[in-house]
């Protein structure tokens, strides 16, 4: 990540390269790339470029059923390499994550969505059966009437305390029971667990894949965490919950914080499998 200060605002340049080299020439199936900031990103995106290797390819920009940008790639010739090179320039002006209004009907939790909205949110309300550990976790959630913001802050922070973070290279998402049993998970594991928790509590929620940009502070904190020692960017996952009047609000259970300017969503979907950064197949080969 490169940093550029422009007239008291901070612009960051993110470069993200995924590169595969094969041991033989292979045919590539059509690929889908979900590495363009989503239309609803609260962080202003100033520029975006996508470069694909091999150069002989066809690209068709689309939006999926959930409004996310995706690039569908078709490769007419066999190749020994495949790369996706993304560059994003974003304006990192500080965002107040609580800068929204909530409809009076949803001002306090618990609340119900009206019938028409509930139909529209149906894919984001589907739950997986709650196992023993998830049921026990949900049973400890207070049901007293409380401001919806306060409820979500407490829920997100509780999950952050309960699940330790780990880098997990295996593909896929852990089952909620496994994440709770281990008290350990990657960002995508904890994000999916939070999605299921919110849905079991009657709140529409979706899985988010995106970039997390963390910048060093100008001065070290005197009474709290000082943040990262160096500017840092990585692929990350978090959750979004739907609040009437406010729309989709990001919650990051890895940090226990609401999503801010450093959270740049790429794909927001009912299921994690629909948010994979790159989808596609090749002929049998070694990579």
Task: Label each residue range with its predicted role.
Residues 2-4, 153-154:
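Acidic, mature catalytic/reactive cores of soluble proteins
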Residues 3-139, 145:
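Linear, non-domain "peripheral" regions
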Residues 9-13, 42-51, 166-168, 199, ...:
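A broad, low-specificity signal for short, low-complexity segments enriched in glycine/proline
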Residues 21-33, 171-180, 236:
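Short N-terminal helix-initiation segments at or just after the protein's N-terminus
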Residues 22, 96, 107, 161, ...:
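Glycine-rich, flexible loop/turn motifs
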Residues 107-185, 193, 200, 272:
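Secondary-structure boundary elements
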Residues 122-130, 277-287:
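A short, charged
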Residues 157, 189-285:
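Hydrophobic/aromatic-rich core segments of domains that either
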């Amino acid at each position: 990540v490169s940093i550029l200060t422009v007239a008291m605002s901070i612009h960051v340049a993110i470069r993200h390269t995924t590169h595969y080299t094969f041991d033989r020439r292979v045919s590539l199936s059509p690929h889908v790339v979900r590495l363009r900031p989503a239309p609803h990103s609260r962080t202003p995106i100033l520029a975006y470029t996508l470069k694909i290797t091999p150069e002989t390819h066809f690209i068709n920009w689309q939006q999926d059923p959930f409004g996310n940008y995706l690039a569908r790639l078709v490769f007419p010739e066999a190749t020994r390499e495949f790369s996706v090179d993304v560059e994003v320039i974003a304006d990192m002006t500080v965002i107040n994550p609580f800068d929204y209004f909530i409809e009076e009907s949803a001002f306090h939790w618990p609340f119900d969505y009206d019938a028409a909205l509930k139909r529209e949110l149906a894919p984001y309300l589907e739950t997986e059966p709650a196992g023993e550990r998830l049921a026990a976790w949900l049973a400890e959630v207070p049901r007293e009437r409380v401001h919806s913001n306060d409820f979500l802050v407490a829920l997100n922070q509780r999950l952050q305390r309960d699940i330790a973070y780990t880098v997990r290279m295996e593909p896929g998402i852990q089952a909620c029971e496994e994440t709770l049993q281990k008290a350990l998970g990657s960002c995508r594991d904890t994000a999916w667990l939070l999605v299921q928790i919110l849905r079991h509590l009657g709140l529409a929620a979706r899985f988010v894949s995106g970039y997390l940009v963390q910048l060093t502070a100008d001065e070290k904190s005197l009474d709290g965490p000082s943040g990262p020692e160096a500017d840092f960017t990585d692929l990350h996952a978090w959750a979004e919950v739907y609040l009437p009047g406010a729309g989709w609000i990001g919650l990051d259970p890895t940090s226990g914080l609401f999503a801010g300017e450093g959270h740049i969503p790429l794909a927001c979907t009912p299921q994690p499998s629909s948010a994979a950064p790159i989808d596609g197949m090749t002929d049998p080969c070694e990579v």
